[in-house]
């Protein structure tokens, strides 16, 4: 799920401050981790996710695309293009490919994503050996 920042409803616009609020933008429980990513064009994390259920990331993410464009493919087959300025929610069961050089910030359930990152590290070791 993605939405442009400018499309989020304004709840306050006064005294030089504008506040926007988007309710029901995913659900989370537990401690979150903050993550900052930079991808070169063409980076596809799919090979690193092979072996996880449905060969996809099993952690949900909330975030903001600072620059570039990425394509998210969900395990059901749907795809979504997310570009600079988009707020995103990616539920568990997805992969990501950078269509151009991209920078993004994500927030993820810490325990869930640590498990995925450990798996990705193991896959990277196999693929680069």
Please name every model-derived segment:
Residues 119-129:
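Glycine- and charge-enriched low-complexity intrinsically disordered segments
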